[in-house]
Regions:
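Nucleotidyltransferase catalytic core that binds NTPs
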Residues: 1-145
């Protein structure tokens, strides 16, 4: 059975901690799908703009570790609807040889993420604690010179 690991984030900017997150997530499965949070979501979060969503998506799409990268369609701070759409693609293809997983970095646990409910409803397994928090995009932006 093919395992597809889904991860998400703002990646604004992308840093070494994100690469480690991708590396550890990819080790759990056969393919890595990265959901890039949109500019709308970044504004909701209140973080500084550094790169727009298209630039972030392009960079993530061109990383060797990443098999698929997509822009979040959600209109809140979650990626619940995007996860639902990814799941629907595999249901429509009737690909029963695929198992989906949603993975979180070391600073997140499955007990606190808003995506937990949709993942459980759709039968998507949860993985958490993928490494320690190595860097912070917010810290990098706040300390840029």
């Amino acid at each position: 059975m093919k395992k597809i690991i889904i991860v998400s984030g703002y990646f604004n900017p992308l840093h070494v901690g994100h690469i480690e997150y991708f590396r550890k997530a990819k080790a759990y499965g056969d393919k890595l799908c990265v959901i890039v949070n949109s500019d709308f979501q970044r504004a909701l979060k209140g973080s500084k703009p550094f790169m727009n969503e298209e630039e972030r998506l392009c960079i993530i799409n061109n990383l060797r570790l990443v098999d698929y990268a997509i822009l979040s369609v959600d209109t809140d701070g979650t990626v619940c609807e995007t996860i639902r759409e990814i799941n629907s693609l595999y249901v429509l293809m009737e690909d029963e040889g695929v198992r989906l997983f949603f993975a979180n970095g070391g600073d997140q646990t499955n007990d606190i993420i808003p995506e937990r409910e949709i993942c459980e409803k759709l039968g998507i397994k949860l993985i958490d604690g993928l490494g320690e928090k190595i860097q912070s995009s917010s810290w990098l932006l706040d300390n840029e010179k």
